């Protein structure tokens, strides 16, 4: 059986993180990356309801907000065959995770975009959310990736630093280029949307423009 580690990117949603931990702790080891330097993530040593100890969790409290790219950088610290990358506003079912594993793809997600070659802006791209499809790139949320595939693009991930937006776009295109494939896959499955609050990256009015700027670099073959 392949081994899996969950990487949760956390920013000001501690209740969501605890809900994800309770769903998966004991099934997979978990790393929580906390990008809120003003409030460390802490988990009780024992869940008061179940009496279960949290034994397989690493908590990384960053002293700076290293944004989303840090979740990919941290993957290289762990030996598991697969990394399941989760945002802190979504909880996939275990059945969905198993489905993603059984597909045995280099990288697979639940959310993707297509139509890059015809689009002139990010909002013109076609959405694929929790459906079985071939897409141009994957979008955050829930992504399962093979560690040996990430190893192929390790230098690019490390050298890019911590860009404000588009880590998922970068990784998607780097993997496509490394493996010489044209599309990536999204899958259907059951998920639970958790409260977003007022801290989502898409609250920034420049969010979609910044993501489109990343797409355009690949569209114009400058990266």
Language-model features: where?
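Hydrophobic targeting segments
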Residues: 2-8, 29-33
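C-terminal catalytic/acceptor-binding lobe
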Residues: 2-4, 13-16, 152-223
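Short, well-formed alpha-helical segments that are part of the catalytic scaffolds
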Residues: 8-26
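Acidic donor-binding segment of Leloir-type glycosyltransferases
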Residues: 21-60
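A short, glycine-/small-residue-rich helix N-cap motif at loop->alpha-helix starts
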Residues: 62-70, 164-165
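Active-site nucleotide-sugar/metal-binding loop of Leloir-type enzymes
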Residues: 72-82
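Short beta-strand-to-loop acidic/aromatic patch adjacent to the donor-nucleotide binding site
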Residues: 80-91
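Conserved catalytic core of nucleotide-sugar-dependent glycosyltransferases
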Residues: 91-160
């Amino acid at each position: 059986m392949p081994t899996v580690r969950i990487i949760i990117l956390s920013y000001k949603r501690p209740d969501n993180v605890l809900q994800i931990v309770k769903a998966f702790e004991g099934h997979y080891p978990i790393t929580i990356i906390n990008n809120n330097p003003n409030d460390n993530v802490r988990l009780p040593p024992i869940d008061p309801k179940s009496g279960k100890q949290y034994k397989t969790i690493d908590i990384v409290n960053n002293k700076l907000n290293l944004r989303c790219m840090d979740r990919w950088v941290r993957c290289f610290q762990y030996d598991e065959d697969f990394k399941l990358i989760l945002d802190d506003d979504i909880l996939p079912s275990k059945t969905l995770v198993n489905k993603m594993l059984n597909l045995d793809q280099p990288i697979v997600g639940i959310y993707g975009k297509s139509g890059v070659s015809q689009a002139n802006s990010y909002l013109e791209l076609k959405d694929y959310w929790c459906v079985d499809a071939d897409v141009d790139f994957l979008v955050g949320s829930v992504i399962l990736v093979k560690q040996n595939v990430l190893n192929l693009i390790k230098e690019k991930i490390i050298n890019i630093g911590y860009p404000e937006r588009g880590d998922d776009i970068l990784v998607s295109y780097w993997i496509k280029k490394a493996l010489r494939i044209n599309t990536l896959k999204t899958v259907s499955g059951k998920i639970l949307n958790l409260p977003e609050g007022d801290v989502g990256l898409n609250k920034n009015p420049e969010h979609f423009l910044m993501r489109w700027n990343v797409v355009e670099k690949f569209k114009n073959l400058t990266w």
